[in-house]
């Protein structure tokens, strides 16, 4: 199975060799669609520019897809039996499976980034990771705050013992103060500028639904697990699931556990190695590999061909 990262994996310098290898995907056509220089933002930054939600999302989608396309070429006849992506990464997974074409995906992801940034700007908000905390405890903590009039929800189910909550700024301050006494081993604020995957993103859902309305979805060449349901998405429901995703919890750990029933290896494709770490924590007895540049793509492709052969 192939796994694609989401927002937070962006780093200045990512994809440097891909900009040389794949100008068809990362060159002027992408810049014209986005209205800004993908190469400049990815390679020159600064990091504060690349971290902006409306920049990070299309940049990560483009670089991860270009890397996937090179990796797929190196794989030859070998093909994944499944795919998933964390949040934004679900779009990369769908493009990799041929459900949407690359430039359509890039357009929708750019609109998604703008819509989520706009929603976040309406109210100071953010996210925090709870470590050493199961889903039941995380939901209880969020419910305690909501029962007291607050705005706090479970946003990511990343791995056993790793949950993420999203909420308004004052609710996150409350969480940092009271999280430990309510059952979390540690509470860590995340460097994101919004309460993603929570009801505070409702306006982004509405905008995204409009953007997705014109998107034609094709049959996937391999199944893609949806964040909202933690099961393979059907073509007829792809647009609805993607619209709902921005204000629904990312059930990534559940997806990995479900996929592990039918796959024996996970391959992270894209900048960083976040989904590989989550796969190691969420499954056991499965090989986990990382493709985050062209050299690792060549090594992993050769290894997988030998294993399959």
Which residues make up each language-model segment?
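Short glycine-aspartate micro-motif
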Residues: 1, 83-85, 105, 154, ...
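Acyltransferase/transacylase module recognition
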Residues: 1-74, 79-80, 213-309
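Catalytic nucleophile loop
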Residues: 6, 83-92, 197, 270
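Alpha/beta catalytic cores of group-transfer enzymes, especially the acyltransferase/condensing modules
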Residues: 7-9, 34-36, 97-249
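A short small-residue
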Residues: 43-50, 92-93, 186-190
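Gly/Ser-rich oxyanion-binding loop with an adjacent helix/lid
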Residues: 57-129
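Short beta-strand scaffold positions
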Residues: 62, 85, 166-167, 268
């Amino acid at each position: 199975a192939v796994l694609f990262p989401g927002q937070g994996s962006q780093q200045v310098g990512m994809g440097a060799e891909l900009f040389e290898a794949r100008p068809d995907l990362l060159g002027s056509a992408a810049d014209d669609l986005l209205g800004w220089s993908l190469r400049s933002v990815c390679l020159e930054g600064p990091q504060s520019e690349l971290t902006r939600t409306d920049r990070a999302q299309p940049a990560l989608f483009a670089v991860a897809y270009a890397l996937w396309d090179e990796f797929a070429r190196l794989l030859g006849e070998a093909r994944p039996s499944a795919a998933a992506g964390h949040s934004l990464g679900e779009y990369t997974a769908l493009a990799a499976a041929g459900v949407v074409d690359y430039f359509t995906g890039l357009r929708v992801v750019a609109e998604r980034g703008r819509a989520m940034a706009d929603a976040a700007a309406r109210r100071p908000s953010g996210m925090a990771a709870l470590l050493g905390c199961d889903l039941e405890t995380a939901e209880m903590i969020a419910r305690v705050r909501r029962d007291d009039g607050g705005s706090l929800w479970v946003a990511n189910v990343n791995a056993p013992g790793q949950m993420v909550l999203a909420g308004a700024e004052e609710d996150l301050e409350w969480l940092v103060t009271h999280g430990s006494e309510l059952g979390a081993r540690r509470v860590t604020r995340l460097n994101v500028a919004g309460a993603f995957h929570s009801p505070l993103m409702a306006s982004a859902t509405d905008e995204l639904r409009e953007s997705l309305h014109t998107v034609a979805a094709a049959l996937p060449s391999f199944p893609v697990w949806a964040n909202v349901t933690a099961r393979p998405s059907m073509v007829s429901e792809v647009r609805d699931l993607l619209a709902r995703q921005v204000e629904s919890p990312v059930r990534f750990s559940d997806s990995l556990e479900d996929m592990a029933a039918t796959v024996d290896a996970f391959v992270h494709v894209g900048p960083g190695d976040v989904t590989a770490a989550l796969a190691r924590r969420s499954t056991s007895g499965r090989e986990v590999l990382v493709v985050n540049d062209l050299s690792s793509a060549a090594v992993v492709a050769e290894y997988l061909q030998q294993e399959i052969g």
